[in-house]
Amino acid sequence: VYDGDTPVNERKRIRDRANIILTNPEMLNGTMLPNHSKYGFDFIFSNLKYVVLDEMHTYRGAFGSHMANVFRRLSRITEYYHAVPHFLCSSATIANPVELAEKICGQPFASVTKDGSAASERNYLLIQPPKISGKDQQYYGQESIVSVAAQILPQLMEQRESFLAFAKSRKNVEVVLKETRDRLDAADFLTTVTSDQISGYRGGYTPIERKTIEQQMIRGDLLGLVSTNALELGIDIGSIGVTVLIGYPGTRSSFWQQTGRAGRSKKSCTNYLILDHLPMDQYIGLEPGWLFDESSEHAVIDPDNLLIELAHIRAAAAELPLSLDDIARFPDLGETIPVLMKMQEVRSQNGRFAWAGGEYPAGDFSMRNIDKNKYTLLNQETGKTITEMDESQAFREIHEGAVYIHDGESYRVVKMDLESKMAYAIPFNGNYYTVAGGETNIHVIHSQKEQQWNRIRVQFGDVNVADYVYMYKKLQFHNLSLIHISEPTRPY
């Protein structure tokens, strides 16, 4: 394994000796390609026979678009070293596996679809939260899916069922985790299990935290995890007997991927779907056969997104000088080269375009999204890092006055410094958490094509998206009662 956690001396041994290297997109983008002529990477690229892309269905949207451009850069490097690798991809069920593979890898593909996985009896249960009235009516007339999940999970733990519960947001992961632990700790809840036998698992936890949680799950120290879609992937956490989906995840592909984490042995498994108040969830409640009768959705990427492609053109120029032949890989190269020359980031050299900018353009962007600005949240009392997140999420989650929950523990944000991109929080024992409110404004810059669909006009083109946060709600744990609506010290 060659990733960010691999010790320096181990990295050298892997570069010198390994025949098979397991790595991740960030390591390929930020270390291997920029240093292709150093540290023995030239030997690896010269002898590269196979490139295997696992979990291909996750490479959609901005992430998949970045990955396609990383492979464009990889093809330049392997061509430079006279290597012609074969590409192999594995994917969960999607409607367009061949199309997605060809867009990401830039090579023709053939599809192999025979299912050889273990088959077991699978049970599916839909849960419609009960209707409520009175002061809690603000939650669309039904009990929240978070509260329902916090009632179900202790019962699964009491039955010693190993489970994964999937929430649709990091916030909901933490609220479900805290409310479940609170129920387990309550004096009137008699059980043989304890609150430390359930944990969260999501982005925002450190690699060490995630690895510790994975090992605890494998050993049986934990009975279950509350996770975002981070655990849709094939991370080894032992045998799972039950999944609990806290709301429909949005696509059939995600539904099957999440429920597919249970029953990977030949034992029967149970999958719960708690229906939210949203129209899609309620439609499934009325027509559950829709989940099983229809095919999965298409996975969509846009490798030619100008912001993403430009970031990788800059990185490619620093790896090897660009030429007009590279237009076959980067369609917008002819438009971007004059801009980069004007910015003095590339210079003309013997009919090619060599990098003249900063030392490390591959480190100037995030592969997981377009937003490259990162914010850090610190525990003001200990100085330790609680989490890191991108700017758009930071404005919603760690603005001044926000209550941020990490591994079931609450922190109140007391300061946010936009210049240093740091926020500071203190431990908080209050009975509420916060949810940001705002609006998203979309301005159409250029419409490339449009079509009338019934009474709806559909356009495709370039847009400018602006998110605003101007208020936040204080919601009480366990019943979602609205305590107060506040304004941040400044709008974001």
What annotation goes with each model-predicted range?
Residues V98-K103, P108-S169:
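Conserved interdomain linker/interface between the two RecA-like ATPase lobes of SF2 helicase motors
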Residues G250-N271:
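Conserved SF2 helicase motif VI
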Residues S268-N271, H277-S295, H312-S323, L333, ...:
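Extended Lys/Arg-rich polyanion-binding regions
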Residues H57-G116:
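Post-DEXD/H (motif II) to motif III coupling segment of the RecA-like Helicase ATP-binding lobe
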Residues L233-G247:
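A short beta-strand element within the Helicase C-terminal
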Residues T6-N47:
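Conserved helix/coil segment N-terminal to the catalytic DExD/H
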Residues E10, Y205-S227:
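Conserved helicase ATPase core of P-loop NTP-dependent helicases/translocases
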Residues T31-H36, E55-V70, V176, D236-G238:
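Conserved ATPase-coupling elements of RecA-like P-loop NTPase cores
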